[in-house]
Design a protein with these regions (language model features):
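An N-cap/entry alpha-helix motif that binds or orients negatively charged groups
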Residues: 2-80
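N-terminal functional module of multi-domain proteins
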Residues: 44-130
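Flexible, glycine/proline-enriched loop segments at strand-loop-helix junctions
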Residues: 95, 121-122, 144-151, 183-189
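Aromatic/hydrophobic pocket-lining residues that form π-stacking "cages" and hydrophobic walls in ligand
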Residues: 108, 133, 254, 316
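Alpha/beta enzyme core
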Residues: 110, 138-139, 151-266, 273-296, ...
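Long, hydrophobic, well-ordered secondary-structure blocks that form the structural core
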Residues: 129-155
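Internal helix-turn-beta structural module
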Residues: 285, 301-329
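A short, charged, Gly/Pro-tolerant segment at domain boundaries
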Residues: 330-338
Length: 338
């Protein structure tokens, strides 16, 4: 399926909240919540997007003409490229009231398995979502990472029990969801967690723990000290704090602070293989992408998602080739200017 066809189909199917813009840059959706927008004043997603595009590439083609390999080893798993599809809490609340997030999670896992990347799924606003996601991950060889919101410690541990039984290659805990208005509305016990509580959860999990929602070097050090195997530099796509810095802006200081201690994933406004290259050049180990995976799902379900993944792969390989990187470990800050 051609990606242009995916976008054309998505426009017909996605519902009123997303316009399937030629550039998924957060301008049209603004602060539309419920929907794909950012927390008021509504500029967070666009700030993320602009920050990546402010980073320029240093082209250098005086290198041996050798094949480009985008594969990495990540938390004990080999991935064909450093890419994870990001979790989504609900389609009914955010996009289309007739749609089921479980089908989206299933399609993402299928596409991830086909393409050799990783997917993830949230615990959602529906109690049926998390158990289904764990079963989906198990069915697809543990490729889908469960992502757990900061509810009560009792609820978190119950979800970790399900994750431990399904044995995906990692599990993630989101610290910044405490700022999601719709989560607090349906789950009044949602809230921030202390470093001691994070340490308790990391020890409770039987698989590598990824802490999502890190936006400062100080926060990254606290997550690493708590026992996280990886962190996700994320402002929740601009959905939890108006006026937050862009993820590309804070990534360098976080890499410098903990890059030798934990794996670093970054999300927020990453839309192309060239953006993936920019993130890796700063020092990230992998990236997460959310909104375009939703668009691709509405444009062709599993086939649409596969089309988007392969588009990203082609763009990443082309950028690597033109900047002199033949494998992911070749990419460094000398290949960009920012």
């Amino acid at each position: 399926m051609d990606y242009k066809e995916v976008l054309a189909n998505a426009k017909k199917n996605i519902g009123p909240n997303c316009k399937v813009c030629p550039e998924c840059n957060g301008l049209a959706c603004g602060n539309l919540m419920p929907g794909p927008g950012s927390k008021a004043p509504g500029n967070g997603a666009n700030d993320n997007w602009k920050a990546w595009r402010s980073i320029r590439l240093n082209m250098d083609t005086i290198f041996p003409d050798e094949p480009v390999d985008t594969g990495i080893d990540f938390l004990g798993r080999h991935l064909s490229m450093p890419l994870i599809s990001a979790p989504v809490g609900s389609l009914k609340a955010q996009y289309n009231p007739t749609d089921d997030i479980r089908d989206f999670n299933e399609c993402c896992a299928e596409a991830a398995e086909q393409c050799g990347i990783a997917s993830s799924f949230g615990d959602g606003l529906d109690a049926r979502v998390f158990p289904h996601g764990c079963e989906t991950s198990k069915k697809h060889g543990g490729i889908a990472i469960p992502v757990i919101n900061p509810l009560s410690m009792e609820t978190i541990k119950a979800n970790l029990d399900m994750a431990n039984e399904a044995m995906p290659f990692a599990v993630s805990f989101v610290v910044d969801s405490a700022g999601l208005p719709h989560l607090k509305k349906v789950s009044p016990d949602a809230g921030s967690k202390s470093q001691e509580q994070l340490r308790e959860l990391c020890e409770y999990a039987k698989i590598p723990m990824i802490i999502k929602g890190i936006m400062t070097a100080r926060g990254a050090v606290k997550a690493a000290d708590a026992g996280a195997a990886a962190i996700i530099v994320s402002n929740h796509g601009g959905r939890v704090l108006g006026g937050s810095a862009a993820t590309a802006e804070v990534l360098p200081e976080i890499v410098d602070a903990v890059g030798n201690r934990v794996k670093i994933i970054v999300d927020g406004g990453i839309r192309s293989g060239t953006d993936i290259f920019r993130a890796l050049a700063i020092g990230a180990d992998a990236v997460m992408i959310c909104r375009p995976f939703l668009i691709s799902y509405y444009g062709g379900r599993t086939e649409g998602i596969v089309s988007y993944i392969e588009k990203l792969r082609a763009e990443l390989k082309d950028t690597m080739y033109m900047c002199g990187a033949r494998k992911i470990s070749d990419i460094d800050r000398s290949m960009i200017r920012f």
